Amino acid sequence: NVGNSYSEYMIKDLLREKYGYEGVVCTDWDITGDPDPDLDAFGSRCYGVEDLSVAQRHLRIIMNGVDQFGGNQDKEPVMEAYRIGCDLYGEETMRRRMEESAVRILMNIFRTGLFENPYLEEEESKKTVGAEEYVKAGYQAQLDSIVLLKNKGGILPLKEKTRVYVPKRHIRGRKGFFRGMLPEQEIRPVSRELLEKHFIWADSPQEADAALVFIESPLTDGGFENGTYVPISLQYRPYTAEHARETSIAGSTWRENDRNRSYQGKTGHTANEEDLDLVINTKKAMGEKPVIVCLTMHNPTVCSEFEPYADAILAEFGVSTKAMLDMAAGVSVPKGRLPVQLPRDMEIVEKHREDVAFDLEAYIDEEGNCYDYGFGLDFQGEKLS
């Protein structure tokens, strides 16, 4: 019971011998180091071979037929693995094995002609890299991906020279992907120079005709807290998982004391809960003047918390701020449609079946629109087809 790269059956017997794969095999990232005993740490994952030394782990992977080590920055464990292998199998065997990997890796370079002609003609490169035609096509793709979820009263597009207020954001410190702490952030979503390409900068809600509120989908700490599992929330306010399953499907690793990973009854928090406050407080300050929410969506979002306070909602999945401003100004028409369902609430999320598509009950906004897979509006409020 070992990780795939350590499995002779998976790599050597099946992949190499039975299915005849002759290409490069690379390990997952960071699987050869000693694991961190802390559950809430991005430690190495040498599953099933914790009793081997780092060099011995490298040797086992090499002898299985793997060619590259993902995330390893130090050649010494590979060299030590070679020396151990020479003692165990002989230098001829080890050299032949290393040459096999060298051939596989180098063939990828040979096939693309990088050895025969590794040089570039600068003028030719300029015709392709950053070529105006491709830049325009790429930017249009950004615009086409933006989804208009709500447009109450046809607020969008905003007229040129509309006085627009954009509030600052605050995100508390949180753990990043590698589990290190990220500092808190004060964010100015839009520069004055960029906004004034279409609109007039307003320093306060009182001066503004409309507000653009930039927020992100809920940012969580990855499901761990104080050595235990907690829910990963898709809502902004603290979420207590009352409807989560009592017994988890999977568990556990050697770092865990309990095979049950259930987080039922536990509470998860988001680093950007203040994004919700930003929408609510901006709406209060703006009164009857329109508030447009610009949502950067990293994952499906429970929109029920902020949607009632928004006159319009634009959702995007990684486009530039310029693209969002151009869309708000009507430079392009909305063509984007949701690639996921946006759930009604977290209870629905907990009850849905992870291996079945489209079984979520999607959120319905005050305009009667259902934020289901494939949903999107045009500026006239008609659903895209």
Regions found by a protein language model. Give the residues of each.
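C-terminal non-catalytic regions of proteins with extracellular/luminal or membrane-system context
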Residues: 1-6, 13-20, 26-36, 51, ...
